[in-house]
Amino acid sequence: MKTSVLLAITAMCSDDWLLVRMKIRPFDKNTDIRIGDIHLRDNCPVTRLLSFNYAFSYPVTSCGIKKIMFQTNDDAILSEISYKPRLHTTYEFPVVCFVKRLKFPSVMHFGMSGFDAHTLKEIPQKTKGQESPTPTQSKTWTLNFNSVNKEQLSKKSLYQ
């Protein structure tokens, strides 16, 4: 397999989608690949024709695309482009893309990430059979909507 062909293929991916682009002329400036001669993995056709590229855009759950999840927060998305000229053998070009999985913090009772939603102070972790602590506010503010000019704007004048 020619190195130039591998450089003619680019892949971008997310946790759910794979986007692959292949140059229309991957071998040299005189040889075009016809749109009907290439497919992604399980005979999935080109989804978009660009000026200089063919594009394949598919969810990772289709077209025989493989998703390998590692114990870290990394995934590998694997596929291949099949190129079959009319009367010749089939050529397979590997497609590999890596993506970091998003790691969302666990949502806690009445707050997120261990902070109370109202006071932004840490909530102690509760153990089994223990009640959740009731959030408390240390100070109450009321808004004063009297007219003020720009120079008077301060925390004291707005919140009394």
Swiss-Prot record:
Highest taxon in the source lineage: Eukaryota
Main location: secreted
Position of the signal peptide: 1-13
Keyword terms, alphabetized: Secreted, Signal
GO cellular component: extracellular region
Keyword Nucleotidyltransferase: no
Family per similarity comment: Belongs to the PLAC1 family.
Name recorded for this polypeptide: Oocyte-secreted protein 4B
Organism: Homo sapiens
Gene: OOSP4B
